[in-house]
Design a protein with these regions (language model features):
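Regulatory and interdomain segments flanking nucleotide-handling catalytic cores
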Residues: 1-389
Length: 389
C-alpha cells in the first residue's frame, strides 16, 4: 500500500493543548525516513554574529525538500539551527542530492558546516518510535507535532561521530541544483511589543507516558496563565512588521539565490529585493488589490502563519512578554527541575527574527520565528548544561 499521503490524510487538531493527548497521534509508516539537519558548532557561529545565516540555512533544508515533493504534504519542524523532516522512501535519492547541494552552498557561501543525515524509520523502531499529529495554526498552515522519542534519537545518530557516517549522504561530484523557490528573508528583525522575547525549550523527564502528557499539559497551561492566551504573547504582531531595505538584512537571502554567481550578480539580486520590498510597502500601505488579494491583509496573514509554538519531542516556544513574567515561569520550571520532572533552557532577546516559506501570498505559507542573537540554539545549549548538572 502506498504510504505517500499518510500525513496529508491525518485529521487536524484545533487546540495546542491537544498535543498532550496520546490518542491524537499516529505512527509514521515504517518505510519512511527522517531527515535531520543542523549547523555544527552553531554556538560559535552565533558568537560571530551569524545567527540569521544559521536560521536561514535551517529553513533552506526544509524548502528544498518541500519543492522536491511538490504538492505532497509532508511533516517538518524548524529547530532554529536545523530541521526535522519526514519523507516517503521514493524521495530519498533526490533528497540526498538536494541536501548535499545545500551543504555545499552553506560551506562555500556562508562558511558554515550544515550537518545532514537521513535515518530510516527501521533504524529507530527497535529503540523508539515516531508518532505524529497535525495542528492547525492558520487557514494557510498546519504544523506537524512529533513525539515518541524517535526524532531525538535520530538527531543523536546524526550528530554522534561514531554513527554519523551511517546516515550521511555520500559525497559525490554531481550536485543537484537545489530549488529554493519560496524562501524569503525580507523582514526587519521584529522588536518585542512588551519587554523581551523569550525562546524556550522544555523537555519532560517523567517515567511514564501518562505522567509526561500530564506535565506537558500543566506546563502549557502555566504558560497560558502567566503570559495570556491568544495573541497576547505572540512575538509577531502586524504593527511591528517592517520590510527590510538595508543590505545586512537582505544579504542572507541574496547569498542563497545568487550563490556562486559573483559579486555583480549578488548586487543585482540585492537591488531586486529592495525594489520588490518597495512595491510591497506601497501595496500594503494603500491596500492595493492584485486579483482578489488585498495586500493590506498580508501582515495579518504572516502573523497568523508563524510557528511560534511547536513540539518535536520537546516543547519549543518563542514568547513576547515582560521580565517579571519570565521570572514567574522560570521559578515554576526550576521547581519542576529540582523535583526531577523536567529540564529546560531559555534565551532572552529584545527582538525576534523570521525566515519565510511562501508558496502563495494568499495561501500556503509558513513563517519560522526565533529569538534574535541565539534563540533556540542557545536555549538548547543551556538545557544540555542543565542536564549535566
Amino acid at each position: 500500500m502506498n504510504s505517500d499521503k499518510f500525513y496529508a490524510n491525518l485529521p487536524v487538531l484545533e487546540n495546542f493543548v491537544d498535543i498532550t493527548n496520546g490518542e491524537n497521534f499516529y505512527p509514521v509508516p515504517q518505510d519512511w525516513a527522517v531527515i535531520i539537519t543542523d549547523i555544527a558548532d552553531s554556538t560559535k557561529a552565533i558568537e560571530t554574529g551569524k545567527y540569521k545565516d544559521v536560521n536561514l540555512l535551517g529553513a533552506c533544508s526544509i524548502i528544498v525538500i518541500l519543492n522536491l515533493v511538490g504538492e505532497l504534504e509532508i511533516p517538518f519542524v524548524f529547530g532554529g539551527d536545523g530541521a526535522s523532516i519526514l519523507i516517503p522512501p521514493k524521495f530519498i535519492p533526490d533528497a540526498e542530492r538536494a541536501l548535499l547541494a545545500v551543504q555545499k552552498m552553506a560551506s562555500e557561501e556562508f562558511n558554515l558546516n550544515l550537518r545532514i543525515g537521513i535515518v530510516p524509520l527501521e533504524a529507530i523502531a527497535s529503540n523508539y518510535d515516531i508518532r505524529i499529529a497535525k495542528l492547525r495554526i492558520s487557514d494557510n498552515y498546519t504544523q506537524a507535532i512529533l513525539r515518541g522519542g524517535g526524532i531525538s534519537y535520530a538527531t543523536t545518530l546524526v550528530k554522534d561521530k561514531s554513527t554519523n557516517s551511517l546516515y550521511s549522504p555520500k559525497l559525490n561530484h554531481q550536485y543537484a541544483i537545489a530549488d529554493f523557490s519560496g524562501l524569503e528573508c525580507r523582514w526587519q528583525d521584529i522588536p518585542t511589543r512588551h519587554e523581551e522575547i523569550l525562546s524556550l525549550i522544555v523537555q519532560v523527564t517523567a517515567p511514564s507516558q501518562t505522567q509526561i502528557d500530564n506535565l506537558y499539559r500543566e506546563v502549557i497551561n502555566q504558560i497560558d496563565h502567566i503570559y495570556g492566551k491568544g495573541t497576547e504573547c505572540h512575538p509577531v504582531v502586524t504593527e511591528n512588521l517592517q520590510l527590510a531595505f538595508q543590505r545586512k538584512s537582505l544579504l542572507s537571502e541574496t547569498r542563497v539565490f545568487a550563490a556562486f554567481q559573483g559579486r555583480i550578480k549578488q548586487t543585482l539580486y540585492l537591488w531586486k529585493l529592495r525594489l520588490i520590498n518597495l512595491l510591497g510597502l506601497v501595496f500594503m500601505t494603500f491596500n492595493i488589490k492584485t486579483g482578489s488579494f488585498n495586500w493590506g491583509d498580508y501582515k495579518q496573514i504572516v502573523s497568523e502563519a508563524t510557528d511560534f509554538k511547536k513540539f518535536d519531542d520537546v516543547l519549543r516556544m518563542v514568547i513576547s512578554g515582560k521580565t517579571k513574567q519570565r521570572h514567574k515561569l522560570t521559578d515554576y520550571l526550576e521547581k519542576k527541575f529540582q523535583e526531577g520532572r523536567l529540564v529546560y533552557g531559555f534565551h532572552v532577546s529584545d527582538r525576534a527574527l523570521m525566515t519565510c516559506l511562501v508558496f502563495e501570498r494568499d495561501g500556503r505559507q509558513v513563517h519560522f520565528v526565533d529569538g534574535a542573537d541565539g534563540g533556540y540554539a542557545l536555549a538548547a545549549k543551556q538545557m544540555k548544561e542543565l542536564m549535566k548538572s
